[in-house]
Amino acid sequence: MSGMWVHPGRTLIWALWVLAAVIKGPAADAPVRSTRLGWVRGKQTTVLGSTVPVNMFLGIPYAAPPLGPLRFKQPKPALPGNDFRNATSYPKLCFQDLEWLVSYQHVLKVRYPKLEASEDCLYLNIYAPAHADNGSNLPVMVWFPGGAFKMGSASSFDGSALAAYEDVLIVTTQYRLGIFGFFDTGDEHARGNWALLDQVAALTWVRDNIEFFGGDPRSVTIFGESAGAISVSSLILSPIANGLFHKAIMESGVAILPLLMRPPGDERKKDLQVLARICGCHASDSAALLQCLRAKPSEELMDISKKLTFSIPVIDDFFFPDEPVALLTQKAFNSVPSIIGVNNHECAFLLSTEFSEILGGSNRSLALYLVHTFLNIPTQYLHLVADHYFYNKHSPVEIRDSFLDLLGDVLFVVPGVVTARYHRDAGAPVYFYEFQHPPQCLNDTRPAFVKADHSDEIRFVFGGAFLKGDIVMFEGATEEEKLLSRKMMRYWANFARTGDPNGEGVPLWPAYTQSEQYLKLDLSVSVGQKLKEQEVEFWMNTIVP
């Protein structure tokens, strides 16, 4: 720990704590680390099938609480503490609709710790092999959770299995959500994108402190799913995140996803006027509105956010200097090795709740109406969409299946493939996958026609079948599913180590070159080429010329 900054008086605190640990006994086994902000004590766990213990450090603050005048503001660094921090319990969730969280646990057959929500929520959890200490220089994988920027937390994911099996450090993060994470006034008073700036703050903390837990700050891989993957893709595009990470994995989400960015101008002004009226601020300008909103209770703002959309990023000329497509076209982004992937039935169930009326079957007119209203496809293009997706489809089931495929193509497959091409053409190594295996444990909770739905791959990536703590990610996995999980853990960790997912014990994963080969992740892994070539061609050259 040579060269490490230690706050005056900490040596005495440390000595007293060690003495107490010796007297009490069990605390002597607790892992202890020093950071630039103070000492932390974690706890130890094990996972199924591995003899490697894992140190867990939970609820470590990476920024100051965004309360009072710091609400709707770029996060400030966390302050050093003189006391020993007990990092053994999960942090509170960022404000979100807790009913959604309960519902998702039932639908996905997962279980999370029961936690309260708070605006004081800028914390992260660290999972490290027990042998890791300052100087170990293990690869670091920083996870950004998904949830449409409206829900999610660091404590819905357990990195113990990945840490134990693959000898890497896992950091799970959480960031402000909804109105707390994205409110903006469209001017200098509140630029917005607070959630994305929280992520930059988390990565800055990792850069400055992860070495004390055994991680290598020069080998940081950021990864996420859905909104977490959009976050990863956005961080690649942002100049203020340059140098904070070195590899990136995007699972089912990229920054050019349609409908992602809030339109500027009159629509934003209208939203602000409605917001002022609902909350009783009656503000005459954005500075006054901001002052009024900062005085409102958290619960009141949470209720307001259910009536208005404040959960999407904006072009703020700071985090996003330009539109994502423009930045990709100009090659004005951080060109790092990347894995990009999708599931083969992204919109079949979890994301189709808005279209529940068609899950039993649909007709052509209803399907085209939904394409027009939900995806904002102009009416003059609808006949082209109909010819491509619904030609010679007559039964309600056929039309439903084509409609769900269309949604997945527009929202995930085409943006993912296009982003992979931009990254490839910028000279960075790219690897693409399509996840194809529906978890068998979900057979009785969703329709039989559903294949690999949105988020299905997460339990495999995290080795959920091998966890035995209070975060349950994969109950009832078959032996074949456990083998697939081990392969995916190895691919992801190999990539974190070297920027290449290939290595001993896993089938070859070809790079995404001009031939556009990709990996089909199923119980039997294989290689495909030009994923959905005709659909990508249709949307890129016919609808978006």
UniProtKB/Swiss-Prot annotation:
Positions glycosylated per UniProt: N86, N134, N363, N443
Main location: secreted
Xref: Gene3D superfamilies: alpha/beta hydrolase (3.40.50.1820)
Keyword Secreted: yes
Signal peptide span: 1-28
Example GO molecular function: carboxylesterase activity
Reaction(s) this enzyme catalyzes, per UniProt: a carboxylic ester + H2O = an alcohol + a carboxylate + H(+)
GO cellular component, one term: extracellular region
Induction: Strongly down-regulated in cats suffering from tubulointerstitial nephritis (TIN). Excretion decreases immediately after castration.
Post-translational modification: N-glycosylated; contains a fucosylated complex carbohydrate.
Misc. comment: Protein specifically present in urine of cat. Present at high level in urine of members of the genus Felis and Lynx but not in urine of other felines.
The protein's name in its UniProt record: Carboxylesterase 5A
Organism from which the protein derives: Felis catus (Cat)
